[in-house]
């Protein structure tokens, strides 16, 4: 999704701006954690000030890719009611099967499902409207249709430039891109959906089931 929005001429994109704060606050030993902390902002108040300030480079749209679990409980949520929110979801089995390729022992709070539904409920209550929800499978099966619907939902004009982009990494990718974005860097468009053949390890089945309820709640609101 970041590639789609980042390829628009009118959009500036930012990649997981709370990641350095999250790693610094939790002490999580993620790959290249020291580099992420050194290159990023670790004060969540300053991060919010940046995200709610002027859009860089004179652009009209500020696309902010967030990970729900990076917004730890200490982070003030009120700023979220002043921005346009959209939620991207994915089947828990596919999330976990993908995650364990890089880190083999995630905990429930590492996967973001519980935080995602908490933030969704907060935003929905504050703005008195349901923010758009996209399911990753729907996006891959029909990217043009889903992105048209998303643009309509957030009040911007759809651009064909959202459907294809040059390969490679971007200046706006996080400092962790070399570790996490190898497959993304190869893409030039949305790849067709293919069910994951990877299996959820037996010791993570219980966590997977805990993720199912918030995922299915959000799935009810998805654009399709």
Sequence positions of predicted segments:
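PAPS-dependent sulfotransferase catalytic domain
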Residues: 64-161, 175, 179-182
